[in-house]
A protein has these predicted regions:
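Bacterial N-terminal signal peptides that target proteins for export
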Residues: 2-15
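Terminal peptide-recognition signature
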Residues: 49, 76, 118, 206
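Short, glycine-/small-residue-enriched flexible loop/hinge segments at domain edges that mediate gating
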Residues: 71-87, 101-109
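Glycine-rich beta-to-alpha active-site loop
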Residues: 96-146
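Charged, glycine-interspersed solvent-exposed loop segments at helix/strand-loop junctions
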Residues: 142-235
């Protein structure tokens, strides 16, 4: 049985324990805490990142896992409304490089910059993408705009500068998605919104973006692979 299958088989109880632990974690900023929970995989440790990304979450995460036996696998549990995009990207790339799966538990949130981290999840055995969204979890995207943009009339030169900055943001987003092998369709979720609004996707939609969906009550994990193959065949 694969690491993913064994993990999911044990998640009904593990998810409840993680949820209880999460309820006690501080929300002031993204505090990295290590939850050593028995989920049927004695060589696996769950690490939670919770709260706003304030600027050094990647350091906190690396500091946390530095204390964990290198022989143990790690699962990143995310619960954040967003914050510093640079930190989200850094976490996502590290998750991908270190083959760390990501998960958002039911009743919790991963939005804005947090999605950059979430999309870096990777199967430690196969090396394929592994991002898990539990039923009842919220995953949200929105468009980022250049800083310092008050509502006022702008000159042509200013608008051209804003256009260049926006293109750079989109390009940077694209490069991140390519790095972590995420669906490029995610760009539509970002560019199709205004920066003040968050576009939350359903569990069914998540499968279209290469995200696995977990029913923690039954332990059933719906993988996007076969659905993606059927969709591709339909496009041919």
């Amino acid at each position: 049985m694969s690491i993913a299958a064994r993990l999911i088989k044990s998640l009904p109880a593990a998810g409840l324990m993680l949820a209880c632990a999460a309820a006690c974690a501080p929300r002031a900023h993204a505090e990295v805490s290590v939850f050593k929970i028995d989920i049927g995989l004695p060589n696996t440790v769950a690490v939670m990142v919770r709260g706003d990304f304030s600027g050094n979450e990647i350091l906190r995460f690396k500091s946390a896992i530095a204390e964990i036996d290198p022989g143990k696998r790690i699962i990143a549990i995310l619960d954040s409304p967003g914050g510093d995009v640079v930190q989200g990207e850094a976490l996502g790339r590290f998750f991908w490089d270190a083959r760390i799966p990501t998960m958002v538990l039911g009743g919790t949130l991963c939005a804005s910059a947090c999605t950059y981290a979430f999309l870096g999840g990777r199967n430690p055995t196969t090396g394929n993408p592994l991002r898990i969204l539990a039923l009842g979890a919220k995953l949200g995207f929105h468009r980022f705009r250049p800083d310092g943009m008050p509502e006022r009339a702008y000159t042509k030169a200013e608008l051209e500068n804003v256009s260049r900055e926006t293109q750079q943001i989109v390009y940077r987003n694209l490069q991140h998605l390519i790095y972590v092998h995420a669906s490029l369709d995610v760009l539509k979720l970002n560019t199709g919104t205004v920066n003040e609004q968050v576009n939350f996707i359903t569990e069914g939609d998540a499968l279209n973006y290469g995200i696995a969906v977990l029913d923690a009550q039954t332990g059933n994990l719906v993988l996007p692979d076969n659905i993606d193959q059927r969709t591709r065949k339909g496009d041919q």
